[in-house]
């Protein structure tokens, strides 16, 4: 039996808390860095070898893609929390049921969303006020990209299973392989074969397919409670209900929040393709802070899920403090780095000075306030890990969706400029940080009383 096949479940119910969280979070953070590299490399190569209009076309569809993927990732997080709780309770039968039900659901969801996205590509792009001069390229990119959704969704569910078992390094490894392949294929399809935005979408799809194959192969040969058997990928009714009860609030939360960002993107689109390109450039950079932070939130949910399942409430409290230290230092640190090195970073994407100007403007409004998101996401992960996924859903829907929609409808017409669009983010982050902190304090009081 190889070392690979002897892989063990990593339980977080004992040992040094800070060390456990840090070493579990690092592969997740790096994994999200690599996942963000998929779209970032597309943008860099498209911007430099095809042009600013093509870059704007890819950027204008990014929010649609994010809505779909984020919703599915929310469900994967919910499944991961259920698996983590079953592992913490040392219930092997429920672990087996949760793993295979999660994969069955992700396959069905992947097929449905792939078909819907392919059929509705043009109406979705047109609904976002996409300028006519980039409309066709936007439709082409999103249509081709939609056929890779099933691979992305299935991979994210497998990664959720690996992360729930404490094996975040394995999903990082496969993302590293896929990211290198993505860069090579981007250069081949865009630079050599001159395939434009279509080449970027095809390269991303192939890379995601390979990540899916690599990770599936691993979970089929591993020798632990999370081993996958193809014939056992079926729905277990009671477990499906439990997973959906946990995953749907997180999925809806992500989807609706991202939908509000689609409205914001639509507001940006009216300012022309150079503003779209600049805003799109910054969103790619922004992903290197936001997505890894979501990984820290996932680590928090996994840690709390296992310890809550084992009844270790005091350990939960200490773990959340450690998570806050990691989350706030990371987000604030990345924000500072972005501001200090803004010129070389932004120049990677394009030589268009107008696009770079708008990207830097977004950076000035976002980077100084990233620390607020550290509080929001760490507390959200902790609350979700305790099985209370409805609470962070309500808080984030209010802060990141309802508040932002009201801003777009009432504040933006008064401000009537690009800066008015940008300002909604730091203000909504502050609202969410305050509300989520209060909810976490209330939760801990209840848990400590019943411990």
Give residue spans per PLM region:
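Transmembrane helical elements of multi-pass membrane transporters/channels
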Residues: 23-42, 144, 178, 207-211, ...
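Small-residue hotspots at the loop-to-helix junctions and early N-terminal turns
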Residues: 50-63, 138, 142, 201, ...
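Small-residue-rich hydrophobic transmembrane alpha-helices
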Residues: 55-115, 152-171, 265, 278-341, ...
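Short alpha-helical transmembrane segments in multi-pass integral membrane proteins
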Residues: 1-25, 83-148, 192-248, 304-369, ...
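Alpha-helical transmembrane segments of multipass membrane proteins
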Residues: 40-43, 115, 157-161, 183-188, ...
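Short runs within selected transmembrane alpha-helices of multi-pass transporters and secretion channels
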Residues: 76, 145-163, 171-179, 200-213, ...
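N-terminal transmembrane alpha-helices
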Residues: 12-50, 63-78, 82, 107-114, ...
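Helix-terminus/linker motif at the lipid-water interface of multi-pass membrane proteins
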Residues: 37-55, 125-132, 188-195, 255-284, ...
């Amino acid at each position: 039996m190889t070392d690979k096949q002897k892989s063990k479940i990593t339980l977080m119910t004992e040992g040094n808390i800070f060390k456990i969280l840090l070493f579990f979070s690092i592969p997740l953070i790096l994994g999200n860095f690599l996942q963000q590299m998929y779209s970032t490399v597309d943008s860099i190569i498209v911007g430099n070898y095809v042009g600013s209009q093509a870059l704007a076309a890819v950027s204008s569809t990014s929010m649609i893609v994010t809505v779909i993927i984020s919703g599915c990732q929310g469900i994967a997080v919910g499944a991961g929390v259920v698996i983590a709780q079953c592992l913490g309770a040392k219930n092997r039968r429920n672990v087996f049921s949760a793993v295979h039900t999660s994969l069955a659901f992700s396959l069905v969801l992947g097929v449905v969303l792939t078909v819907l996205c392919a059929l509705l590509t043009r109406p979705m792009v047109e609904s976002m006020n996409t300028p006519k001069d980039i409309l066709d390229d936007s439709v082409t990119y999103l249509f081709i990209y939609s056929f890779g959704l099933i691979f992305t969704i299935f991979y994210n569910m497998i990664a959720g299973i690996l992360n729930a078992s404490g094996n975040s390094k394995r999903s990082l490894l496969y993302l590293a392989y896929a990211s290198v392949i993505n860069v090579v294929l981007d250069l081949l399809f865009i630079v050599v074969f001159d395939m434009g935005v279509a080449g970027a979408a095809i390269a991303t799809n192939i890379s995601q397919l390979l990540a899916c194959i690599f990770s599936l192969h691993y979970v089929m040969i591993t020798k632990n409670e999370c081993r996958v058997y193809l014939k056992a990928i079926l729905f277990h009714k009671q477990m499906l209900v439990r997973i959906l009860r946990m995953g749907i609030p997180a999925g809806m939360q992500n989807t609706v929040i991202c939908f509000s960002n689609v409205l914001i993107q639509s507001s940006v689109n009216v300012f022309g393709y150079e503003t779209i390109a600049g805003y799109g450039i910054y969103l790619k950079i922004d992903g290197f802070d936001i997505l890894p932070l979501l990984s820290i939130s996932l680590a928090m949910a996994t840690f709390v899920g296992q310890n809550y399942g084992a009844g270790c409430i005091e350990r939960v409290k200490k773990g959340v403090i450690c998570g806050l230290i990691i989350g706030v230092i990371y987000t604030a640190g990345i924000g500072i780095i972005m501001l200090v090195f803004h010129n070389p970073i932004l120049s990677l994407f394009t030589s268009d000075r107008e696009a770079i100007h708008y990207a830097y403007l977004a950076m000035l409004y976002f980077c100084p306030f990233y620390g607020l998101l550290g509080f929001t996401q760490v507390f959200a992960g902790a609350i979700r890990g305790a099985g209370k996924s409805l609470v962070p859903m309500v808080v984030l829907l209010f802060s990141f969706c309802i508040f932002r929609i009201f801003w777009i409808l009432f504040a933006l017409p008064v401000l009537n400029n690009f800066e008015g669009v940008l300002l909604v983010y730091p203000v909504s982050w502050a609202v969410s940080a305050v509300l989520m902190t209060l909810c976490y304090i209330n939760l801990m009081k209840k848990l400590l009383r019943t411990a």
